[in-house]
């Protein structure tokens, strides 16, 4: 399986088309990010291992398949990544949630890390690292660096976004060729300000109604 995947499910693509529209309200944008995050989680969790478990139905005992107890952590890159967390938790409510806080220096376009808060057993968990946008790749690279410094295993890290620029994908793959990348769309390019084109604007501002 390729370590880079565009998830082309019709429901995801339909909701993404509405999300991109500039007239989408903060409420609509927030709800759509939540919904697409949940749908992306369905695809990203496709390879979770299963085990046989014996249960009893109202009729008789039987053997069923359940996820094999693999621990999961959802780690949003703040602040926009928070918008994807609740949707994933709807599917996987037992997951732990960590946080990696970053902001982008608007002059250098480089990320600055200000917070890392992770489950103590992060080394033993499969990790969904989430951020709606993969633009230059700087924030994602720094976030994966932070996870690896805290003993997270590369094979357990999956970066999940809604929209990616080719430049960001290339940069993240170069820095961390050992992690998987999932996106709902691979867009055309970055503009001179480091924003994805056509993109969907500033995801954080649109999620939280700020400027």
From Swiss-Prot:
Keyword Methyltransferase: no
Name assigned to this protein: Uracil phosphoribosyltransferase
CDD domains named in the record: PRTases_typeI
Domain of life: Bacteria
Function: Catalyzes the conversion of uracil and 5-phospho-alpha-D-ribose 1-diphosphate (PRPP) to UMP and diphosphate.
Cofactor binding description: Binds 1 Mg(2+) ion per subunit. The magnesium is bound as Mg-PRPP.
Pathway of action: Pyrimidine metabolism; UMP biosynthesis via salvage pathway; UMP from uracil: step 1/1
Gene: upp
């Amino acid at each position: 399986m390729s370590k880079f995947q565009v998830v082309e499910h019709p429901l995801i693509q339909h909701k993404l088309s509405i999300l991109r529209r500039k007239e989408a309200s903060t409420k609509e944008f927030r709800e759509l990010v939540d919904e697409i995050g949940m749908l992306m989680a369905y695809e990203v969790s496709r390879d979770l291992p299963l085990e046989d478990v014996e249960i009893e139905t109202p009729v008789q005992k039987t053997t069923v398949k359940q996820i094999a107890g693999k621990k999961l952590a959802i780690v949003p890159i703040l602040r926009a990544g928070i918008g994807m967390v609740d949707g994933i938790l709807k599917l996987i409510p037992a997951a732990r949630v960590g946080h990696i806080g970053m902001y982008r220096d608007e002059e250098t376009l480089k990320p600055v890390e200000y917070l890392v808060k992770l489950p103590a057993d992060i080394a033993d968990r499969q990790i969904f690292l989430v951020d709606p946008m993969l633009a230059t790749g700087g924030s994602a690279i720094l976030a994966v660096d932070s996870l690896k410094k805290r003993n997270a295993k590369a094979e357990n890290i999956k970066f999940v976004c809604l929209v990616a620029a080719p430049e960001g994908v290339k940069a993240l793959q170069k820095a961390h060729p050992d992690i998987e990348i999932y996106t709902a769309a691979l867009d055309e390019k970055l503009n001179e300000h480091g924003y994805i084109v056509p993109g969907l604007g500033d995801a954080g501002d649109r999620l939280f109604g700020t400027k």
